[in-house]
Swiss-Prot record:
Catalytic activity: GTP + H2O = GDP + phosphate + H(+)
GO molecular-function term, one example from the UniProt record: GTPase activity
Any one annotated GO CC term: mitochondrion
Main subcellular location of this protein, as a coarse class: mitochondrion
Binding, GTP: 51-58, 118-122, 172-175
BP GO terms, sorted: mitochondrial translational elongation
Protein name: Elongation factor G, mitochondrial
HAMAP family assigned to the protein according to its UniProt record, in alphabetical order: EF_G_EF_2_B
Transit peptide: 1-24
Biological or metabolic pathway of the protein: Protein biosynthesis; polypeptide chain elongation
Length: 750
């Protein structure tokens, strides 16, 4: 054998040995080989790894891949080997050391197929978390052992609740100074209102952290050998036995409060065995009544295998989650809800949701979650939105940037296909007549805008191609062309969001661009109800136009002030029902520009209560014009206000700088809500208008000698102060060369 051949053989033997070690990492027998895609439903898990930025979730995912034998070596997010973490495969992700887009992979863990989506932690990329959680059955919430529950944790928690996703909590970075699972536990209970309890106790503090106490099984676990591959069981250390017993009792009490079986045993003074506790944890986790809290350090290779075991033990398989769709009845055309079958066969037609689009080497890559039936290569599927017919030419499973060809995907699987021209959130089926609609994901509204243009005019074609692709892939990245200023405007979730796309245009399309000064995405809303009675009548020699509407425009409450609502509250047939779509169409068109600074109108409810029509002249265009002219009249007569995005800001700084930082935030009109101090660092949480937070990164660095950092996420829209509204309007008029109407009035009086 040649030297190269001997080297390859040795390398292969070493990989095989490592795989065997990984299989025995949790003292379980290796699974038998099963063909992927036909595994029983109870041996499938679809999970996401979610967290606040810099909590270590990508490192956690990297360890999962390694221990499951998916990769042969581990790399760090900010590694010195210039390789980077497997799931951060974009060049920009590796350069910046952050996750920008969600990435999918799958592993085999002792006979269970785990589909994993690693999601970004930065708030600017929150839509990636939204579309991941929409199609997942469970999640691992990663918390930092030092930081505990942080600002983005609140957002992730709301997203988990929105899609009813059960989760377990992994407290990471237990090797860091000041790390403790108790801070995370307190945050879960008192900040996020979860029924949570520890199932692990750390052994050793800070840099001496070297294992965990498994409170359910009643023993200690140590992670030894190269990469922590060997998991050694031992007795619980003497100095932890009393605390372990107390925490175990606390665990049982928290489960007994929400589980009938364990509750009865607790009331009857019966002690549950290990298996009964495991089963009770699973029952309560699946119904989102309990959150088990685990501990470990992904970077130091401790606790991850035990966490993967908990994913299999406690998180639901696809058959334990009820997934619904709406279809139209054949007789009346009314919508009705149906429950999708999780059976992994073709008894029922395929139903799948396209939840993510991505431009790949071979064209558009469309990620699917299969909810019912099976999808095979060569199948014809129909889009429920418009009935268009598409043939599935290639079917793959993703592992970060790599893919594996498959022939069939079954209910519960996550797969991808090429050449499917569609939009994110569309539902497809093999039954042309079924036309099911799965509930789509929540898409937050952009809060910041910038002008953008290519540096070189010759790059105009690539500039348009890049914008077209990125706006199709990311529904929170939007563009429009300002005819007045003759410039393209892009909008997104934050400065970083837009900067990343600008850099991608340069790296992926060889089109360097210039970004303008950031501007706030204001909204315009009514300050008080406005009653209207408007008649539209137009006679031009031919067919005339007529429409009359009466009703009220109400401002919506603060929790709904980003939408526009329309309702028919008429009695009788003064306005025929078939004309209301035209009124709605007119409303949808005119709310694009409000009366103050031509920002989008939001937070209003237009209620039509009465009116009249003409048998001939009340055409669709007549009713559209009736609505639009009524709104224009309201622009003159009603009390309109500006709404601005309010951001939740979390600043972490050395305690000696806390006073200066609080002062600086207050000067930016921030309302301080919480301050906390731990191990020499202070955390300041506040709410501040987005318009007042531009440039704060530089100021914070200056105030804290470069040691402070802050994160910011959208909280809500709220009315500006009258002074701020006057200032914004004056700046807008100056920018567009429009005279102040109040000044004209003053001159006339003189």
């Amino acid at each position: 054998m040649s030297p190269l051949g001997r080297f390859s053989a040795v390398a292969q033997s070493r990989r095989q040995l490592n795989n065997v070690l990984r299989r025995f990492a949790s003292n379980e027998a290796p699974s038998s080989v099963v063909v992927p895609g036909v595994r029983p439903i109870e041996r499938i898990r679809n999970i996401g790894i979610s967290a606040h930025i810099d909590s270590g979730k990508t490192t956690v995912t990297e360890r999962i891949l390694y221990y499951a034998g998916r990769i042969d070596s581990m790399h760090e997010v900010r590694g010195k080997d210039d390789v980077g973490a497997t799931m951060d495969f974009m060049d920009l992700e590796r350069q910046r050391g952050i996750t920008i887009q969600s990435a999918a992979t799958y592993v085999d863990w002792h006979g269970t197929n785990i589909n994993i989506i690693d999601t970004p932690g930065h708030v600017d990329f929150t839509v990636e978390v939204e579309r991941a959680l929409r199609v997942l059955d469970g999640a691992v919430l990663v918390l930092c052992g030092v930081g505990g529950v942080q600002s983005q944790t609140f957002t992730v928690n709301r997203q988990l609740a929105r899609y009813n996703v059960p989760f377990i909590c992994f407290v990471n970075k237990m090797d860091r100074n000041g790390a403790t699972p108790l801070k995370a536990l307190d945050g879960l209970r008192n900040k996020l209102n979860h029924n949570a309890a520890l199932i692990h106790l750390p052994i050793g503090k800070d840099s001496n952290f070297n294992g965990i106490v498994d409170l359910v099984e009643g023993h200690a676990l140590y992670y030894e050998g190269e990469g922590g591959l060997i998991v050694r069981k031992d007795e619980i250390p003497k100095d932890l036995r009393v605390e372990a017993e107390d925490r175990r009792q606390e665990l049982i009490e928290h489960i007994a409060n929400v589980d009938e079986t364990l509750g009865e045993m607790f009331l009857n003074d019966q002690t549950p065995n290990v298996q009964q506790i495991h089963e009770a944890i699973r029952r309560t986790v699946v119904k989102r009544a309990f959150v088990p809290v685990l501990s470990g350090s992904a970077l130091k290779n401790k606790g991850v295998q035990t966490m993967i075991n908990s994913v299999v033990k406690y998180l639901p398989d696809p058959s334990e989650v009820v997934n619904r769709a709406t279809v139209k009845t054949e007789t009346t055309g009314d919508e009705k809800g149906i429950i999708l079958s999780p059976k992994r066969n073709n008894d029922k037609p395929f139903v799948g949701l396209a939840f993510k689009l991505e431009a790949g080497k071979y064209g558009q890559l469309t990620y699917f979650r299969v909810y019912q039936g099976q999808l095979s290569k060569g199948d014809t599927v129909y889009a429920s939105r418009d009935g268009r017919k598409v043939r599935v030419q290639r079917l793959v499973r993703m592992h970060a940037a790599d893919m594996e060809e498959i022939t069939t995907a079954y209910a519960g699987d996550i797969c991808a296909t090429f050449g499917l021209d569609c939009h994110s959130g569309e539902t497809f089926s093999t039954d042309q007549n079924l036309a099911p609609h799965c509930e789509s994901m929540h898409i937050p509204e952009p809060v910041i805008s910038m002008a953008i243009k290519p540096v070189n005019r010759k790059d105009a074609d690539n500039f348009i191609k890049a914008l077209t692709r990125f706006t199709k892939e990311d529904p929170t990245f939007r563009r429009e062309y300002n005819q007045e200023a003759k410039e393209t405007i892009v909008s997104g979730m934050g400065e970083l969001h837009l900067e990343i796309y600008a850099q991608r245009m340069k790296s992926e399309y060889n089109c360097p661009v210039e970004l303008g000064k950031p501007t706030v995405a204001y909204r315009e809303c009514l300050g008080s109800p406005y009653k209207f009675h408007f008649r539209h009548k137009k006679q031009t020699g031919g067919q005339g136009q007529f429409g009359e509407i009466e009703g009220v425009i109400d401002p919506l409450p603060s929790d709904r002030n980003t939408v526009v609502e329309f309702s028919d509250e008429t009695f009788g047939n003064n306005i025929p029902k078939n004309l209301f779509p035209a009124l709605k169409k007119g409303l949808d068109a005119i709310v694009a520009e409000g009366p103050l600074i031509k920002s989008r109108i939001a937070g209003i409810h237009v209620r039509i209560q009465d009116g009249s029509t003409h048998a001939v002249d009340s055409t669709e265009i007549a009713m559209i014009n009736t609505m639009q002219n009524m709104m224009r009249e309201s622009f003159e007569k009603a009390n309109w206000l500006l709404l601005e995005p309010i951001m939740k800001v979390e600043a972490t700084v050395p305690t000696e700088f806390q006073g200066n930082v609080v002062t600086s935030l207050t000067q930016r009109n921030a309302l301080i809500t919480t301050t906390d101090s731990t191990e020499g660092y202070a955390t300041v949480i506040c709410e501040a208008p987005l318009s007042d937070m531009f440039g704060y990164t530089s100021e914070l660095r200056s105030l804290t000698e470069g040691k402070g950092e802050f994160s910011m996420e959208y909280s809500r829209y709220a009315p500006t102060t009258l002074e701020a509204q006057d200032r914004v309007q004056a700046e807008w008029r100056q920018l567009h060369g429009i005279a102040d109407p109040n000044e004209k009035g003053k001159k006339k009086k003189k």
